[in-house]
Amino acid sequence: ILERYSNIASLGEQGVLQNIYNEDNSFVQICNGIEVVGPSKEYVLEVAGQALDSRQGDSIDNETTVNAASVQISIDLGTSKILLVGDASTKAIEDNAKKHQIIQIPHHGRLDHAEELFEIKKDDKDTVYIISDNKGSSSGGSEELISRGKDKGHTIFNTRTEDTKTINSTTYQKSYRVGSYI
């Protein structure tokens, strides 16, 4: 693999790339209260194997192999946690989604990802969902998603269509601004 992707190996030697796993396969803590929580090493290996095998195509779990294994970050707000997932597949984030109270919907709020998350969290109506989107319904964050989610009683913030939100309440000990920073 290193021969085929020597450019990636050389970036790692320059200190640009860092392993998200410690030697004991636990995840790296970025700083106090912020840590990498996924994807699991097993899932990354499954995705990498699929990506390297030209007979299998370049998608896994309804997502491209590049996106499926996006890094997942957990931010501890005190009594609640926020999960940032990039473009990860729902399968890759399922276990972490169950442990978080505020979740970024993958792939800019793509409807199929949102519906799967709503199903995973169906017994938890207090979950807050964030759509990080600046493109509109072509890549996620559609009005249909907002409507469906709110009809089911979910709280959803969309960075494209709403003013910057500050997530705080008596539930959260710390507050963070949620919005687009360009």
Role assignments for model-derived ranges:
Residues 1, 82-88, 99-112, 128-135, ...:
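Active-site neighborhood of phospho(di)ester-bond hydrolases with catalytic His/Asp-centered motifs
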Residues 1-43, 65-67, 125-182:
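Binuclear metal-ion centers of metallo-dependent hydrolases, dominated by the metallo-beta-lactamase
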Residues 21-102, 110, 167-182:
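Core dinuclear metal-dependent hydrolase active-site scaffold
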